[in-house]
């Protein structure tokens, strides 16, 4: 056969100079005082006599191209390029190398398969005959051209001679053999071409071991041991590859059946659990079937399963002294070592195939070194692997029950930090994912400069954590296949033809037809079971997503006995109520007793229904805040409407108070409702249904599961509050307090002036809120401390520890940072909100008198509890006083009392007008329970503020309120409605308008203020300031309603709207597209809304439904704004009592 010269100059490459890369691969032998040479490599033959391994050829040949990365055949014409952009820095690459791609990837014109793990285009299967000569020859010549094209200086004669020799060898034998130099070149170029490898910057520093003369499995084992010894290098990892004989006819392959040279076993235990690495279950069982003796540990190194010359595989145990393992520990958490984790130091891929010049090498194990996330994120945290994430999260004290706490992110970061720390401490080579990403970006720049492209698989190269923080995230990439290349292979045990049937592993596979029949039969049975079950529909309406989460939780519980489905109210048709058997509703209450926006449509349809043709059972759970008088109003409205329609209530309507034990209340109600449903519908085997532990684990409090330990460290107050509430807490100082009410008034409303520490604090806008973290009253705290049974040192810093679910170790409870019991009761825990029913149930165990215990148990019933709660509104101290036999431990208080929440106040100043200050308008709250006959109670925050002295610190943070700000267009007219302390945000409005007028020359539109109070000589807040704003033209008009003028009828803000401002309101809202703002308590807001709707309905002749839609549109357009607060009490003092609770006051 003549040499096909037409192939000679097919390969074209591109010029480019590359800077010499630092050898961090440890392949270079470093003599002290000598300058390392980049071409010097460690010769493994030097280990021959020490280890007794056979001699074999290594990559130290002298005829390797001087610079593999300088391919410099200049093209005569510039190929068409693809533009690649880095969206992080704007850098542009032009890829021309993709024209040399040798095969199509899996993606199609209408289908992207980039995220498929092992696509067909990247996988080579077995062969049953040699590669045809007509296929082999062009590929061989293509590779020879590529090899000789990589030299700095052309070697024409040698190039032509080699082409001639290869051609004749193929013609004579049907195949050809690579020289050592060509093999070294091929292995390195295959690494260079690997699109899924992030560490390719080291591609030229690969040590090549030539084991092509190997003939038996025993020899393979010795070569692999040599590889492991060299590459491990006592922890100073060196990248290496061992190449075994090439494929001939496909029937005499050399294969390594392991996916990695070193990997841990995974065992399926009798109880169904998995011990070890779940990813290796199948291969571990294969090893056992082949005669390996399992040890059933978590980290057992699997044996090598080696196939030589197509023979049946043989099993070889790796000598333990060859396997370097790293024990995991954390730089901060001592308990991390208790997890008993470790990992092997050498990541050596063993099951890939090297393709080069038409030749295939199905056994070519190679290694680099680890990137930390491969172990810390994938091996340890993947759910299908060791899956330690939640255990670490619990030990860290994170809120693993809620995704919004970001516990997964925090835990995986610490696990990754532990891996890096452990490897570095034991001097084992590892690279963090940020450094790896940076190195790849450098490699990519080099490649585009050197050869006009760099194949890269973005999905694989972006690390599994940090995302856009790494530079590779922002880099566009092209993915294509070049030759030489490393391909995936089909697992050998799936295609191997066994010669000794005795060695064949026991077949466990189920035939496909049998499997299909089994699945079909099971699905039929399940359909029958589900069809026979009672249908349960779970409806939800939500603004924040909380109700939906609880609805799905409820459906999961009911799915143990019912055929459940979850539906949002906006997707539910009211006429389908006729088909229901069991209806469960979970909904929040929004605004002034309204339903959430996604429940509006169903509410209208439901409340227009007159009767049901078919009745059903139902139960309702409402979420809300007891600060508002319309607490869970929408849930109760649904309950009443369904009852009136004839449906039967399955369980009393549940209430979840966001201020007190909402989750506990839901779990208790869910279990109660589930059991009632099982009884009502006579569910088969209802007594055998095991309710999930998470619904019942909080029902009791076991002292032996908690303990207090002394802690030498404690956080300062701001850091502690930031940790507890996940807020950016800063300190302000009290400048002054001024009582805005006159001496004639028995009440107190404060103008609170706070100053920033430092030159300037966080920015804020008019209408936004300041959240303040108050302290509980000293008398309440001391009273509780005196009744705690194990509190000898209330000022000693302690840490609460909780016994893990397994009962094997203690973990720190991160709900509270280390603190003293006094500090916790003062600043961190809510001791004024009445205990929940569940808390009373837990308290009952500490009562030493039986009558007290029985009474506490009785209060766990909803009717008893509600009467007791709303009559007494007891603080925790009053509960201890009512039941004096209670002996409560400190751990109970730290673990069970609710967190003291911040109090929000509308900011009453403009930052432009008073740059270094924040002003608040605060009503000081005092009231008596039991119709004025009970003990005197004080608002937590208002009382705390009233007792502050100048320069006292105030921990706080700014909360943005995007829906309650001045119009973007200052020319739009506004109506501001705010009686009492509802005036607070409007003071910031007029200060901002004053500043804009004086310093920016901006003239605002009409701003009409409607204010309300009792008497002009008692509580007309900011009266003189309002008058000044009118004189300066900032306020257009001020209208005031007085409700306590002697001899005159009570006038409220809604009366002014109806009698004096009807035309102005209609003009602003309808004619001029202006804005209306309402700030105050919910009752006032409801009355104002009712008045406005009547006014607009009369002006436009609208029906009730039409006017509701009109105001819904106003809110959607963000022209009707409400800032509503609650804390209006049904247990207020009798009329005339000087301690009567002011409406709408924040506590």
Curated annotation (Swiss-Prot):
Its UniProt entry gives the catalysed reaction(s) as: 2 L-arginine + 3 NADPH + 4 O2 + H(+) = 2 L-citrulline + 2 nitric oxide + 3 NADP(+) + 4 H2O
SUPFAM superfamilies registered for this protein in UniProt = Ferredoxin reductase-like, C-terminal NADP-linked domain, Flavoproteins, Nitric oxide (NO) synthase oxygenase domain, Riboflavin synthase domain-like
Residue ranges of domain Flavodoxin-like in the record: 536-674
Q: Indicate which residues the UniProt annotation says bind FAD.
A: 769, 903, 905-906, 921, 923, 927, 940-942
Which residues make up the binding site for L-arginine?
260, 369-370, 374
Q: Where does (6R)-L-erythro-5,6,7,8-tetrahydrobiopterin bind?
A: 115, 378, 459-460, 473
The segment(s) forming the FAD-binding FR-type domain are 727-967
> Which molecular function GO terms apply here?
actin binding; arginine binding; beta-catenin binding; cadherin binding; calmodulin binding; cAMP-dependent protein kinase regulator activity; flavin adenine dinucleotide binding; FMN binding
Induction field: By interferon gamma and lipopolysaccharides (LPS).
* Residue sites binding NADP(+) per the record: 747, 926, 981, 1014, 1043-1044, 1050, 1052, 1054, 1087
Instruction: Cite the post-translational modification comment.
Output: Polyubiquitinated; mediated by SPSB1, SPSB2 and SPSB4, leading to proteasomal degradation.
Put simply, this protein is called: Nitric oxide synthase, inducible
Source organism per entry reads Rattus norvegicus (Rat)
Protein's gene: Nos2
């Amino acid at each position: 056969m003549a040499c096909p010269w037409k192939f000679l100059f097919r390969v074209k490459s591109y010029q480019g100079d590359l800077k010499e890369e630092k050898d961090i691969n440890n392949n270079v032998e470093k003599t002290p005082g000598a300058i390392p040479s980049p071409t010097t490599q460690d010769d493994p033959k030097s280990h021959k006599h020490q280890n007794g391994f056979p001699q074999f050829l290594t990559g130290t040949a002298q005829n390797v191209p001087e610079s593999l990365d300088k391919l410099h055949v200049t093209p005569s014409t510039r190929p068409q390029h693809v533009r690649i952009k880095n969206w992080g820095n704007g850098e542009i690459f032009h890829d021309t190398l993709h024209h040399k791609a040798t095969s199509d990837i899996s993606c199609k014109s209408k289908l992207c398969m980039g995220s498929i793990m092992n696509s067909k285009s990247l996988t080579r299967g077995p062969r049953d005959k040699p590669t045809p000569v007509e296929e082999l020859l062009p590929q061989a010549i293509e590779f020879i051209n590529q090899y000789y094209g990589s030299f700095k200086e052309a070697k024409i004669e040698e190039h032509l001679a080699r082409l001639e020799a290869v051609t004749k060898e193929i013609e004579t034998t049907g195949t050809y053999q690579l020289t050592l130099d060509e093999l070294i070149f091929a292995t390195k170029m295959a690494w260079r071409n690997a699109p899924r490898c992030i560490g390719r910057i080291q591609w030229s520093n690969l040590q090549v071991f030539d084991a092509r003369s190997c003939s038996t499995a025993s020899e393979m084992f010795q070569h692999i041991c040599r590889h492991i010894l060299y590459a491990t290098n006592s922890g100073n990892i060196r990248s290496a590859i061992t190449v075994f004989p090439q494929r001939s006819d496909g029937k005499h392959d050399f294969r390594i059946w392991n996916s990695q040279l070193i990997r841990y076993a995974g065992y399926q235990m009798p109880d169904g659990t998995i011990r070890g690495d779940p990813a290796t279950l199948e291969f571990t069982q294969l090893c056992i079937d082949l005669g390996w003796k399992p040890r059933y540990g978590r980290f057992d190194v699997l044996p090598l399963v080696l196939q030589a010359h197509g023979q049946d595989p043989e099993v070889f145990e790796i000598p333990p002294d060859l396997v370097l393992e790293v024990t995991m520990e954390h730089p901060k958490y001592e308990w991390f070592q208790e997890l008993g984790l470790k990992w092997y130091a050498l990541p050596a891929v063993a099951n890939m195939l090297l393709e080069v010049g038409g030749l295939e090498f199905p056994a070519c194990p190679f290694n680099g070194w680890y990137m930390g996330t491969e172990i810390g994120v994938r091996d340890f945290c993947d759910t299908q692997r060791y899956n330690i994430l939640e255990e670490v999260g619990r030990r860290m004290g994170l809120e693993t029950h809620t995704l919004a706490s970001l516990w997964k992110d925090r835990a995986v970061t610490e696990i990754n930090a532990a891996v890096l720390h452990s490897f570095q401490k034991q001097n084992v080579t590892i690279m963090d994912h940020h450094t790896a990403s940076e190195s790849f970006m450098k490699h990519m720049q080099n490649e585009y400069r050197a050869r006009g492209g760099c194949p890269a698989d973005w999905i694989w190269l972006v690390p599994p954590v940090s995302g856009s923080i790494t530079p590779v995230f922002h880099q566009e990439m092209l993915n294509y296949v070049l030759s030489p290349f490393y391909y995936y292979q089909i697992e050998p045990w799936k295609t191997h033809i066994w010669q000794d049937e005795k060695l064949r592993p026991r077949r466990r596979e189920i035939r496909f037809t049998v499997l299909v029949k089994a699945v079909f039969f099971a699905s039929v049975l399940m359909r029958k079971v589900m069809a026979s079950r009672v249908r349960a529909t779970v409806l939800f309406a939500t603004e924040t997503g909380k109700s939906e989460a609880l609805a799905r939780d409820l459906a999961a519980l009911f799915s143990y006995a019912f055929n459940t489905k979850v539906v949002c109210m906006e997707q539910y048709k009211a006429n389908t109520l006729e088909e229901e058997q069991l209806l469960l509703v979970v909904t929040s209450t929004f605004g002034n007793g309204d339903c959430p926006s996604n429940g509006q449509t169903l509410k209208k349809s439901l409340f227009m229904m007159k009767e049901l043709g078919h009745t059903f059972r139902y139960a309702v759970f409402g979420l809300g805040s007891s600060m508002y008088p319309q607490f869970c109003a929408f849930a109760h409205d649904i309950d009443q409407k369904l009852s009136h329609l004839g449906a039967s209530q399955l369980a009393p309507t549940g209430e979840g108070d966001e201020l007190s034990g909402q989750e506990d209340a839901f779990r208790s109600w869910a279990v109660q409702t589930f059991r009632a449903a099982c009884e009502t519908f006579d569910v088969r085997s209802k007594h055998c249904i095991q309710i999930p532990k998470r619904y019942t684990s909080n029902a009791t409090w076991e002292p032996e599961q908690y303990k207090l330990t002394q802690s030498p460290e404690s956080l300062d107050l701001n850091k502690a509050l930031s940790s507890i509430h996940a807020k950016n807490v800063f300190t302000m100082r009290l400048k002054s307090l001024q009582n805005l009410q006159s001496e004639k008034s028995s009440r107190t409303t404060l103008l609170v002036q706070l100053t920033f520490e430092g030159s300037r604090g966080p920015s804020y806008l008019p209408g936004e809120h300041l959240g303040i973290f108050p302290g509980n009253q000293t008398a309440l705290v001391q009273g509780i401390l005196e009744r705690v049974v194990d509190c000898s040192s209330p000022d000693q810093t302690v840490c609460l520890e909780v016994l893990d679910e397994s009962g094997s170790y203690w973990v720190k409870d991160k709900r509270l940072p280390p603190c003293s019991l006094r500090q916790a009761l003062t600043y961190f825990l809510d001791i004024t909100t009445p205990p929940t029913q569940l808390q009373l149930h837990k308290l009952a165990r500490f009562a030493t008198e039986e009558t007290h215990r029985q009474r506490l148990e009785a209060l766990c019933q909803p009717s008893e509890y509600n009467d007791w709660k709303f009559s007494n509104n007891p603080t925790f101290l009053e509960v201890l006083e009512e039941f004096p036999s209670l002996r409560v431990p400190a751990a109970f208080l730290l673990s069970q009392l609710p967190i003291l929440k911040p109090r929000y106040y509308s900011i009453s100043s403009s930052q432009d007008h008073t740059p270094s200050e924040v002003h608040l308008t605060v009503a000081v709250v005092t009231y008596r329970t039991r119709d004025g006959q009970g003990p005197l109670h004080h608002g937590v925050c208002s009382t705390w503020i009233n007792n502050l002295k100048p320069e006292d610190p105030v921990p706080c943070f700014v909360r943005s309120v995007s829906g309650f700000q001045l119009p973007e267009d200052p020319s739009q007219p506004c109506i501001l409605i705010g009686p009492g302390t509802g005036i607070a945000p409007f003071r910031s409005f007029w200060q901002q308008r004053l500043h804009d007028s004086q310093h920016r020359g901006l003239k605002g539109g009409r701003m009409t203020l409607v204010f309300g109070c009792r008497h002009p000589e008692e509580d007309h807040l900011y009266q003189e300031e309002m008058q000044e704003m009118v004189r300066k033209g900032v306020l257009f008009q001020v209208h005031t309603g007085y409700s306590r003028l002697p001899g005159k009828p009570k006038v409220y803000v809604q009366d002014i709207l109806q009698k004096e401002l009807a035309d102005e309101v209609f003009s602003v809202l309808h004619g001029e597209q202006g804005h209306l703002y309402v700030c105050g308590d919910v009752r006032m807001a409801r009355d104002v809304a009712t008045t406005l709707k009547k006014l607009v309905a009369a002006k436009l002749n609208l029906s009730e439904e039409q006017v509701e839609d009109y105001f819904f549109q106003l809110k959607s357009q963000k022209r009707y704004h409400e800032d509503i607060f609650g804390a209006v009490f049904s247990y207020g003092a009798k009329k005339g009592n000087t301690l009567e609770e002011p409406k709408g006051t924040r506590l």
